Swiss-Prot record:
Family matches, as SUPFAM superfamilies: N-terminal nucleophile aminohydrolases (Ntn hydrolases)
Cellular compartment(s): Cytoplasm; Nucleus
Biological source species: Bos taurus
Cysteine pairs bridged by disulfides in the record: none
Cited Gene3D superfamilies: Glutamine Phosphoribosylpyrophosphate, subunit 1, domain 1
Homology family: Belongs to the peptidase T1A family.
Protein name: Proteasome subunit alpha type-1
Entry-listed glycosylation sites: S110
Length: 263
């Protein structure tokens, strides 16, 4: 994308009917590390890939706790996500204090849509540069919602956002018919397999770079990090690309592996 006379402010329309500042914010989501959300009849699961800014830094948190029945995973600007997460927590607290009941997931997503729409229509403001996957469980069952910097939000059976997320979405589309009948362990494994598709061929999922969030019937939202992720990774089969590569004798050069597709 290149600068032009129609991208100076979010209130300026281009002749093609586009708002470039919003499109730039959507690009920020694509730069964030990938995250996957999917649901069955009883549970909703978030799986996220964590990044470290440098070898000296700890991995950033990608899954955040909102309420006992809701959690989010993020892709994009972490600072913007932190602000939206605090807003969501406050709304959930208000619901419990005023009405003595958990806030319905769809109502919370609607409030987030209204809040993120305001900067897209006011001079001198910029859109939030973060996309959210919201997992929750209420009287209507498990939910996975996606929110965008454009203030649109979508109710999904499964979704992936972030860098190279198209590979994960392809996996989800291919196996979507299996999710509703899955037990919790199988659902998490599907999420891990989809997330693994976003990695280059030479990398794999580890306890350091994966975070898992689970919520469901009779199960409050729980985040699994570091060693807590091990039981889920142990049951995961090896990547098909690695299985297909036989060990080459020392005197025979190994064939060059296919380059991972860029998305």
């Amino acid at each position: 994308m290149f600068r032009n006379q129609y991208d100076n402010d979010v209130t300026v329309w281009s002749p093609q009917g586009r708002i470039h500042q919003i499109e730039y914010a959507m690009e920020a989501v694509k730069q964030g590390s990938a995250t996957v959300g999917l649901k069955s009849k009883t549970h909703a699961v978030l799986v996220a890939l964590k990044r470290a800014q440098s070898e000296l830094a700890a991995h950033q948190k990608k899954i955040l706790h909102v309420d006992n029945h809701i959690g989010i995973s993020i892709a994009g600007l972490t600072a913007d996500a932190r602000l939206l997460c605090n807003f969501m927590r406050q709304e959930c607290l208000d619901s419990r204090f005023v009405f003595d009941r958990p806030l319905p997931v769809s109502r919370l997503v609607s409030l987030i849509g209204s809040k993120t729409q305001i900067p897209t229509q006011r001079y001198g403001r910029r859109p939030y540069g973060v996309g959210l996957l919201i997992a929750g469980y209420d009287d209507m069952g498990p939910h996975i919602f996606q929110t965008c910097p454009s203030a649109n939000y979508f109710d999904c059976r499964a979704m992936s956002i972030g860098a190279r997320s198209q590979s994960a979405r392809t996996y989800l589309e291919r196996h979507m018919s299996e999710f509703m009948e899955c037990n919790l362990n199988e659902l998490v494994k599907h999420g891990l397999r989809a997330l693994r598709e976003t990695l280059p061929a030479e990398q794999d999922l580890t306890t350091k770079n994966v975070s898992i969030g689970i919520v469901g019937k009779d199960l409050e939202f729980t985040i699994y990090d570091d060693d807590d992720v091990s039981p889920f990774l142990e049951g995961l089969e090896e990547r098909p690309q690695r299985k297909a590569q036989p060990t080459q004798p020392a005197d025979e050069p190994a064939e060059k592996a296919d380059e991972p597709m860029e998305h």
